[in-house]
Amino acid sequence: SICSEPKKVGRCKGYFPRFYFDSETGKCTPFIYGGCGGNGNNFETLHQCRAICRA
């Protein structure tokens, strides 16, 4: 499941505010995505994160 993947900032130096599902807390948490090399646990909105990961 993408919701159990770790937060992955990526190797690029962009600045994209995103959300990931933190499986330890059971919550969608904000983080800054670098723009490339991430994984599926990377959502543009809090609503999208909550809808997919049922947070």
UniProtKB/Swiss-Prot annotation:
Keywords: Aspartic protease inhibitor, Disulfide bond, Nematocyst, Protease inhibitor, Secreted, Serine protease inhibitor. Disulfide bonds join C3-C53, C12-C36, C28-C49. GO terms for molecular function: aspartic-type endopeptidase inhibitor activity; serine-type endopeptidase inhibitor activity. Its main location: secreted. Residues 3-53 form the BPTI/Kunitz inhibitor domain. The record marks K13, G14 as: Reactive bond for trypsin. The keyword Transit peptide does not apply. This is PI-stichotoxin-She2a. It comes from Stichodactyla helianthus.
